[in-house]
Amino acid sequence: MQTGLPRQRAGFTLVEMLIVVAMIGILAAIALPRINLSRLRSKGAIQGLGTTMLAFQREAIGRQHNMVIMVDVPGRALRALYDSTNDVRINNNERVRIIPVGEEIVFGKPAAVPARSFGANPVNFTTTELSTGLPAMVLYRNGSAKEFGGLYLSTAKAMAGAPGHANETWAMELVRATGRAEWLRWNGTAWVRGF
């Protein structure tokens, strides 16, 4: 015969678990609308493009031929031409890679944001790829760029002037001597370097 205190069960009841799940749902319903997903998406897209530009510069040096990066504004993408003939034209035997800029990201800047020294247009390069007519950046095989220029990237909400989205505008400046793409972010009052 067993005597003593009854054994207590470890664990949670179904009712307790349902209460916890309901509380998590209520908190999520309150918090999720306040998360700025477009800011996170824009930062992710810019970091991805920054890394891609660095890789293209290294590719030009490593393969010892020009890299032509075309800016397709309507298609919201960059097109990279591995220009083995160094003629700034797509030929049959040359590889072209398309890099989308990201969800909700567009080329351009809101009218209220001041322009950088390279100009106010969404894309400010005078070189064009000869077969498509798209504005292009040319990275030479020594790592330098053909010209100084830049482009602006922004979220659709920032372009529309939505409140709370003014700091979702970015500028990329291509330095001619080094071929380095420098990134700047509009913080609402000034351009600041970095991601």
Predicted regions and their residues:
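N-terminal helix-rich module
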Residues: 2-21, 25-51, 58, 66, ...
